Amino acid sequence: MARRQGPSRSPWAPTQRRRLATDCPCSRVYVLAHTAAAVANSEQYSVENIPYAGGNYHDDYDPRPGGRRHDSDYSLDPNAHHDAYYSQPYDPAPHDASPGGAYGTQPDHYWQDDDVGRPMIQGANAYGPDPHDPDRDPHPDDPFHDEPAPTPTPAPIKRWKTVKEVQLFKGNLVLDCPIPPRLLNQVPHAQPPERDEFTHMRYSAATCDPADFDAERFTLRQKLFAKPRHTELFIVITMYNEEDELFARTMTGVIKNIEYMNSRTNSKTWGKDAWKKIVVCVVSDGRAKINPRTRAVLAALGVYQDGIAKQQVNGKDVTAHIYEYTTQMTLDIKKGVVGVKKGNTPVQMLFCLKEKNQKKINSHRWFFQAFGQVLDPNICVLIDAGTKPGKDSVYQLWKAFDLEPMCAGACGEIKAMLVHGKKLLNPLVATQNFEYKMSNILDKPLESAFGFITVLPGAFSAYRYVALQNDKAGQGPLEKYFAGEKMHGANAGIFTANMYLAEDRILCFELVSKRNCHWILQYVKSATGETDVPTTMAEFISQRRRWLNGSFFAAVYALAHSFDIFRSDHSFLRKTMFLVEFVYQTISMLFAWFALGNFFLVFRILTASLQNELGTAGKVLFIVFEWLYIAVLITCFILSLGNRPQGSNKWYMSMVYFWGVIMAYLMFASIFITVRSIQSQIRNNGGFNASDLLKDKIFATLIISLLSTYVMWLVVSIIFLDPWHMFTSFIQYLLMTPTYINILNVYAFCNTHDITWGTKGDDKPEKLPSVTTKADGKADIHAPTDDADLNTQYETELHVFSTKWKEEKKVPSPGEKQEDYYRGFRSGVVLFWMFCNLALTALVLQAGGLELTVSDPDEAQEKQNQASTIYLAVVLYSVAGLAAFRFIGAMWFLVVRMVSATCRFTSPIY
C-alpha cells in the first residue's frame, strides 16, 4: 500500500520572506478586515496590535538600547503596505541578511543574555531596564554595552482591567499572544514590528469534538506558512497530573532527540532544519487535573499563558484550549529542581489543555483525529509523561519505519528507571526491573520475529499514520481503538469494558488484520525509554489490576477473532506464522488461567516429598505451611473483594513477606530433593550415573524445568549482551513470584467490575470568562496588556517550580457505588475461576471424594502419587517447551537483526 503524499519536505530557502497570516496579539487587538465578506471567505485570519494600527504606529518595546529598527519598507510605513500585512504568510525570517539563521532574526543585543549561565529566576526586574522608558539609556554612546542599568520596580499587573476587541473567524476564537519580553530577550526572534513563530504564542479555543476539528475550520500553525510545513514526526506526550520533574524528564529526552536529528547533516530526511519537520504535542487530561508546577514549566517554555483561556465562545462550551509556540528554551533537572535555559534547537510545540478529564483514550483522539488530520504526519510517536526516551531513540523508531515500508507500528525497550542502581535496593523495583528485562529479551523479540507484537506499550511506541486510517466505510484500526472511549460507562458490556482497559492491544491486532493490507509490527532494540515504576505495593497492585484485566480480555478478543487475519493481504507463510503465534498465546493464556492452582499443586507435591526426607520435622512444616497457605489465600480474596490496596497496605505487605517465605521454602525443597536423589543414586549404584538418575521422574522434571528457565534466562541474557539484571534482580524476582500469582491475579479477577483507570473526573475547574460576538462580528475579551504585565506573569510562573517538588499526601475521595450488573459479573468470573482451579487441585491430588473410588488405602496412595507425578511432568515439561519456543524466537530475531545490519552497512545514510 502506497503512503499518502504529504506536502513537500524540502526546507525553505533562507532568502524567502515569511510572515504569519494569523497575526493576532493578545494586547489591544482589533481586526482591520477589508470587508466582512472577505473575512468570511478567507482561510486565514489577521489582527493588528493597537500600537501599530490605524495610523497610530509607535513601538512600546525595543530590546536594544540603541532603539535601531528593522530597515524594511514595511517597518517604516505599515499603512503604506496595508494589503500586504493581511496577505503575507507567516515569516520567521523577515530580513534576509539578519543573523538569526534559518529560524529568525536575532537582535543585536540582549540584556544580560550573553551570560548563558545566568539563572532564569532573579530578583525584581531581572530581565533588564524598563522597556517603556526609551530615554533611560545609561550608555548612549555605546549601544552594545554589556552592563545592565539599574531598573525601577515593575508596576502592578493591570491585565484584568483591559478589554480588547477581536474578530471571530467562522465563530472560532483564535488569538496570537505576544511572548513576555523576559523570555523573548533570551532567544533569536524577529524585531518589532515584524513577528514570527518565536514572538507570539497562538491560542485557539476549540468548541468541538476532536473528530470535527478540521471540519469546524480550526487549523494549526504548520499549515499557515507560505509554504506549509510537512510533519514527518508527530510526537505526543500524554499526561494527567504528573509533577514538573516527570514532565521535564520526558520533555528533555524529546528535545535531545530533536537536537540529534538536527545534527544528522548527511541525512536525506533530517539535518539543519529537521526541527521544522517535527511537532511535539502535549495533551493534558483536564484543566482541573493538571499539576500547577507542570503548567508553570510549560509557561516558562512559552507555550502557555495564564488569563488567555475562555470558558465559552458564543454560547458553545470550550472543549480544549490549544496553545502553539516554537520554543527555543530547554529544561534541565538538578537535585529534583527543574530549570529553564536557552536551548540549541527550536521545538515546534502544541499544548492541548482539555477542559474536562476524559481519560487517556480521549487525549489520543485529540492527537490522531484532530491534530493528525490537520498535519497529516508520516510517523506518530506516543510517550507517557515520566518516560524518558534515549538521546536517539525517537530517531531509531523512525528509522524502523523508513527501512520497512510495511511496518505499521514499532516499540522500543522500556527500562525501569534505577537512578544509577540506587532504586534496586527496593525489592519491588528490582522485581519489575527483571520482569521488564526478560520481556524485552524473550517476549518482544519472539513476537517481532512473527510480525505481530501483542501490545505496543503506550508509554513509548510509534505508528505509521496512514496505516491507522479507517476505510471509506469508517471501519478500521482507529475506529476500533476509539470505541473504547464509549466503553467506560453503563452502556458498555463488562467484558468489552475490561477489554478496552488495554485498547492498545486491540489496536495492534486490528493493524495486522486490516482488510486488504499486510502491515506488520516490529520491536526496535536500539530504541530505549526509561520510566518510573511503582515503589509501593498499593501502587503496584492498582497498576497491575488494569494491566492484567485489560490484557486478559483483550487476548480473549484477539484469539476469538484470530481468523480475521485471513481478510488481510498477508502471504500464506505470514498467515501461518500468525496462527502458530496464536496457538502459543492460547497455551500461555491457559497457564495464566490455571496459575493459582498450578502453584499450589507444585507447592504441595514438593513439600509432601520433602516430609518423607525430613521425617517428623518435614511433616510438621508440611502441615503448618499448608494451613497458612490456605488461610493467607482466603485473606487475599476477602481483601480484594472489599478493600482498596491503599487502605490495606499493611495486610498486603504481610502477605508479600509470607509468599516470599513460601518461595524460599520451595527453592530449598527443590535443591534438597535434587541433592538427596543424587546421593541415593550414588549409594545404591556405587557411583554416579546420569542415565539412572534421570529415571527418577521428580528429579528429572525438576532439573529440566530449572534448566529451561533459569539457566536459559542467563544464557539468552548473555547473548543479548545484557546480563546484569540476572545478578542484581534475579533473587528478588524469584521471591516475588508467588505475589504475582496469589495477590496480583486474585485482586485483578476480584475487581473486574472496576473498569476505571484509577482516576476520577469529579474535580471542577475554575470558571473562565466567556466570549460572545457582537452585531459587528467582533467580541470583547480580557487578556494581559503590556510588556510589564507579561513579564510579571512570566516571573510568577517561574517561581512556581523554583523549589523541589514535595509529594502531598492524597486524601482519598469517596468511592462511587458500582452497578449491580458489574458486581454480579465480577462474582461470576471469580467463582468460575476458583472452581476451575479447585477442580484441577482435587483431580491431581485425588481429593474431594475422588479418593473414595479406591477402597485399598495403599492403592489410593499409589494412584495419588502417580497422578501427581504425571501432573508435575506435564506442567514442567510444558514450561520447558514454552521457554524453548521463546528462546528460538529470540535467537531468530537476533539473527535477522544482525543480517539486516550487515546488509545496510553499505547503504545510504538515513
From Swiss-Prot:
E.C. number: 2.4.1.16
Catalytic activity: [(1->4)-N-acetyl-beta-D-glucosaminyl](n) + UDP-N-acetyl-alpha-D-glucosamine = [(1->4)-N-acetyl-beta-D-glucosaminyl](n+1) + UDP + H(+)
CC per GO annotation: cell septum; plasma membrane
Top-level taxonomic group: Eukaryota
Keywords (A to Z) from UniProt: Cell membrane, Cell wall biogenesis/degradation, Glycosyltransferase, Membrane, Transferase, Transmembrane, Transmembrane helix
Region entry Disordered, spans: 56-156
SUPFAM superfamilies: Nucleotide-diphospho-sugar transferases (SSF53448)
GO BP term (any one): chitin biosynthetic process
Any one GO molecular function term: chitin synthase activity
Membrane topology, from the record: Multi-pass membrane protein
TM helices/strands, residue ranges: 366-386, 448-468, 583-603, 620-640, 655-675, 701-721, 730-750, 828-848, 876-896
Subcellular location(s) of the protein: Cell membrane
One Pfam family cited in the UniProt record for this chain: Chitin_synth_1N
Biased composition (Basic and acidic residues): 57-84, 130-148
Segments forming a coiled coil: none
Primary enzyme class: transferase
Function statement: Polymerizes chitin, a structural polymer of the cell wall and septum, by transferring the sugar moiety of UDP-GlcNAc to the non-reducing end of the growing chitin polymer.
Protein family (similarity comment): Belongs to the chitin synthase family. Class I subfamily.
Name this protein carries in UniProt: Chitin synthase A
Species: Ampelomyces quisqualis
